[in-house]
Amino acid sequence: MISQFFILSSKGDPLIYKDFRGDSGGRDVAELFYRKLTGLPGGESPVVMYHGDRHFIHIRHSGLYLVATTLENVSPFSLLELLSRLATLLGDYCGSLNEGTISRNVALVYELLDEVLDYGYVQTTSTEMLRNFIQTEAVVSKPFSLFDLSSVGLFGAETQQNKVAPSSAASRPVLSSRSDQSQKNEVFLDVVERLSVLIASNGSLLKVDVQGEIRLKSFLPSGSEICIGLTEEFCVGKSELRGYGPGIRVDEVSFHSSVNLDEFESHRILRLQPPQGELTVMRYQLSDDLPSPLPFRLFPSVQWDQGSGRLQVYLKLRCDLPPKSQALNIHLHLPLPRGVISLSQELSSPDQKAELGEGALHWDLPRVQGGSQLSGLFQMDVPGLQGLPNHGPSPLGLGPASLSFELPRHTCSGLQVRFLRLSFSACGNANPHKWVRHLSHSNAYVIRI
């Protein structure tokens, strides 16, 4: 049972507010939540907070805060599951979940909340069941995008135009417009991995963790069967080996309740009949042992002239992906000592960009090809550096560096989708369209200096 539900933007602006029980302090509660959240030290943001007589439970999605409040002693895990399901529902019915789609579909969001929750009690979170009650049509605004006009793929990879879906293809609502009777039968399957790495200052690997998901978004009629074939060498646990190669191993795996696993042990095939909308077919985790080298290595060199207070940092970034692969949207964040007053730079390519901001060096590289390396020489004047104490992991107060990036068509675990088959009889005469994408991105890629 919840008292309130509200959605805030990344800046704390209220986008949606719903009071179910009338036992709250009004809209001021949303402002109180954001003030408490942003006042925490070190950017901490616990998903469960308690203030006064009220519990706040929240999740973040695409820069938005989805928050539920309750005065009762309710299991936080059940409310977190409800918020996650609400995020999926809003994405299904609005096409995608972000500040723009919420602002354009306020009436639709309130209608969904009225059907999902009655006096704070959950009635249903089924996308399929709600289709019978939701009358408001989603307002979809398709922005102009060069991705739809060029030969650039979904994640920036160059490919043939007729082999990729438009960039906004998966961002349409599952409830088709009454004026649009030609909605395509399509299914989108994404294999997404989040990579967490900690590298010591001497280059040794201290920690590595991969969190992966197979996500499905279906626009097929209900009852359509989907068959997903995974890599045959895929194995779970260290004791299981398949095939003649080293195998593609994960430590843990879990499946959606609708997945039929009868053929998983023998052929690594998943079968399911999903409702329209988005669901997570499978989650998996791999720690401490990657089948391939890390995507990036950083080689720093630091020189400090104590007399002049000049600090020189040379960074060489090497991409250890295969030559045919590439990384996109690379951003390096390097905390600097206090008192930096100037920055001069020499970059190895003209498309790079570096600047100072919020006490750190920000180095942006739009694209890096596998097997290549890029470098940057940064010189800074830090007069106050002479008085810093000489202790800690970095005596100069430099680092650690953190990297963020995307790896299209690449999975760090090696897991691939062999095939995606659909039940044609259930889809009618129209030939369904299938799209499979693989993507890895950084979660916390930290390198000590």
From Swiss-Prot:
UniProt keyword annotations, A-Z: Endosome, Golgi apparatus, Membrane, Protein transport, Transport
The keyword Signal belongs to this UniProt entry's keyword annotation: no
Entries under Pfam families matching the protein: Adap_comp_sub (PF00928)
Keyword Transport recorded: yes
Signal peptide positions (record): none
Gene Ontology molecular function: protein domain specific binding
UniProt subcellular location: Golgi apparatus, trans-Golgi network membrane; Early endosome
Membrane topology (UniProt): Peripheral membrane protein
TM stretches of this protein: none
A biological process from GO: protein targeting to lysosome
Main location: Golgi
Domain MHD: 184-448
Any single Gene Ontology cellular-component annotation: clathrin adaptor complex
Family according to the record: Belongs to the adaptor complexes medium subunit family.
Function: Component of the adaptor protein complex 4 (AP-4). Adaptor protein complexes are vesicle coat components involved both in vesicle formation and cargo selection. They control the vesicular transport of proteins in different trafficking pathways. AP-4 forms a non clathrin-associated coat on vesicles departing the trans-Golgi network (TGN) and may be involved in the targeting of proteins from the trans-Golgi network (TGN) to the endosomal-lysosomal system.
Subunit structure, interactors included: Adaptor protein complex 4 (AP-4) is a heterotetramer composed of two large adaptins (epsilon-type subunit AP4E1 and beta-type subunit AP4B1), a medium adaptin (mu-type subunit AP4M1) and a small adaptin (sigma-type AP4S1). Interacts with tyrosine-based sorting signals on the cytoplasmic tail of cargo proteins such as APP, ATG9A, LAMP2 and NAGPA. Interacts with the C-terminal domain of GRID2. Interacts with GRIA1 and GRIA2; the interaction is indirect via CACNG3.
UniProt-recorded name of the protein: AP-4 complex subunit mu-1
Protein's organism: Mus musculus (Mouse)
